[in-house]
A protein has these predicted regions:
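Secretory targeting and sorting signals
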Residues: 1-25
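Serine-esterase "nucleophile elbow" of acetyl-processing enzymes
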Residues: 23-93
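Residue-level preference for short coil/turn positions at secondary-structure junctions
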Residues: 37-38, 89, 117, 160, ...
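Flexible, glycine-rich phosphate/dinucleotide-binding loops
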Residues: 51, 102, 173
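Alpha-helical scaffolding within the catalytic cores
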Residues: 75-78, 105-113
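Functional beta-strand-loop-alpha-helix junction segments that form "active/interaction loops"
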Residues: 91-103
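Alpha-helical cap/lid subdomain in secreted, periplasmic
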Residues: 108-257, 261-264, 272-281
Length: 281
């Protein structure tokens, strides 16, 4: 075999080793240390939080400031962090999160992620399932889990090599604790923000306290189901270990229009606590 043929085959072999077959960029290995795979596309699934609602000074979705796929420098999103390591993801960050979305809406978003062939998928859902008009209207825990499983199954079936990050629901009860004696927050909440939790926000009566605790308990139950669903998914799913729920946020991290959704600083905080460091699971 001629020498240039040998060299050509060697180059092809190196190129093959540098790609894992999914299109993910892989840095060169150092010794026996495994290479880190950086996705070249991603999708965000969820509700108004991930849609960046209220993060751009008005009460509309503002995807550019999403903790997941945002492009704005004010929020060091997952997309921006990945882009620093893999420029191929530029323009390939898809945000399918919708204000008002519940777990029942997640499967349609998952199908969109499949159509986009997303190599990295973030999931933050459940706040609206708890923020019903009445406590009895909250999504039952078993139903919630069934809907989460259906969406994750859609991703796994069509994108078995993609990485999935499932994020915990924020501690909405803490939000009430922080704002129930804040005049501006109370005025905003009285417009109908998360009524199961925030209705009659200044009351410290037994019935209202019991209602709020029911909502808090339901969110805890949802988070347990999210963790279990991710565990059942397998090694390609990463749970945030409750990091978002455990954030000790202040009212400075929510917008001062509805006193509910994260502002740009809040979105940046979400990006920080959910960032896995590298996407190699």
């Amino acid at each position: 075999m001629r020498r240039w043929h040998v060299i050509g085959l060697a180059v092809l072999a190196v190129l093959a080793l540098a790609c894992d077959g999914t299109g993910m960029a892989r840095p060169a290995q150092s010794g026996t240390r495994s290479a880190v795979s950086w996705p070249s596309s991603m999708a965000a699934l969820g509700d108004s939080i991930t849609a960046g609602f209220g993060s751009c000074f008005t009460l509309v979705a503002c995807e550019r400031r999403s903790w997941s796929t945002g492009s704005d420098s004010a929020v060091d999103s997952h997309y921006r962090r990945i882009r620093e390591a893999n420029a191929k993801i530029r323009g390939q960050a898809h945000n399918y999160a919708k204000p008002g979305a519940r777990a029942a809406d997640l499967n349609s978003q998952a199908r969109a992620a499949v159509a986009a062939k997303a190599q990295y998928v973030t999931v933050l859902i459940g706040a609206n399932d708890a923020c019903a008009r009445r406590v009895q209207d909250m999504t039952p825990v078993r139903t919630f889990r069934t809907q989460i499983d259906a969406a994750l199954r859609t991703v796994k079936k069509s994108l078995p090599r993609s990485r999935v990050l499932v994020v915990s629901i924020p501690d909405l009860y803490r939000l009430w604790q922080l704002g129930h004696d804040d005049e501006q927050a109370v005025r905003a909440w009285n417009a109908g923000i998360c009524p199961a939790l925030l209705a009659n926000p200044t009351s410290t009566g037994i019935a209202d306290g019991r209602r709020r605790r029911q909502v808090a308990n339901r969110i805890d139950a949802y988070n347990r189901q999210l963790a279990d669903a991710c565990r059942a998914y397998g090694t390609r799913c990463r749970w945030d270990n409750g990091e978002v729920h455990n954030v000790r946020f202040s009212l400075d991290l929510v917008n001062h229009l509805d006193y509910f959704h994260p502002n740009s600083e809040g979105q940046a905080r979400l990006a920080e606590v959910t960032w896995p460091g590298r996407i190699s699971w």
